[in-house]
Design a protein with these regions (language model features):
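N-acyltransferase acceptor-side catalytic subdomain
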Residues: 1-235
Length: 235
């Protein structure tokens, strides 16, 4: 299979097959195009996602292997279980999407900048208004302390980013997502790439072909209707 980088046309909402993605950098498939809801949804339904530095044009990726978590097999170690039991917090769904994505876009202490630009924020806010993008929020004493956001495609959730202002807040948010998603027939969480944080939670690396086959299968299967209704949830 030939591998090449495709320049996208702003007028055409189209992507090449992910099998053409470059091996180095791993998964880079296309460049350019807008961040319209139609293009973003077309990308995610083909296992493609945008990621680029703010000074770069939009870059589209489909890495091989793909990092995934099966929500019913999430690894919650003893230490994290104790933290969850002993830490007072409230959890909600879709109560503060804009605040979550804004917090995810804020510069981190461990990084020089952020990849979530203002156009990216506005694009996912639009997807949220259309019912495709969702958030999980962790609260303490009425203050938003951690959260994550992503897209739901049938029984698959495409995680995008997370943040935390408290110790282990991001892990608690991931546990909340997995348990809530599994209770509503969710079957797979796309984490895009392996990293040390996700390794502690049981991330698996699947060949891209396996991930795309599962995406095609799960993307047309419905969740329980109440999954993304705004409100509080419990672990």
């Amino acid at each position: 299979m030939s591998r090449y980088l495709t320049q996208l046309d702003d007028e055409l909402c189209w992507f090449p097959d992910p099998s053409h993605a470059l091996e180095e950098p791993n998964g880079l498939l296309a460049i350019g195009g807008d961040l319209s809801p139609a293009r973003l949804l077309a990308a995610y339904h083909k296992g493609i996602f945008p990621w680029n530095e703010p000074h770069q044009p939009t870059l589209w990726w489909s890495p091989d292997p793909r990092g995934v978590i099966r929500p019913d097999q999430l690894h919650v170690g003893r230490t994290l279980q104790k933290i969850i039991r002993r830490t007072p917090f409230d959890i909600s769904v879709n109560r503060a999407f804009n605040e979550v994505i804004t917090a995810c876009a804020a510069p981190r202490r461990t990084a020089d900048g952020t990849w979530i630009s203002q156009p990216m924020i506005e694009a996912y806010q639009q997807l949220h208004l259309l019912g495709h993008a969702h958030s999980i929020e962790i609260w303490q004493e009425g203050e938003l302390q951690a959260g994550l956001y992503g897209l739901s495609i049938g029984r698959l959730f495409c995680g995008e980013s997370m943040f935390s202002r408290i110790d282990n807040g991001a892990k608690i948010a991931m546990v909340a997502l997995c348990r809530h998603f599994a209770r509503h027939r969710g079957a797979l969480i796309d984490c895009q790439m392996q990293n040390p944080f996700l390794a502690t939670l049981g991330i698996e690396e699947w060949p891209r072909a396996r991930f795309l086959a599962e995406l095609a299968r799960l993307g047309h299967q419905p969740l329980l209707a109440s999954c993304w209704q705004e409100g509080e949830i419990s672990l």
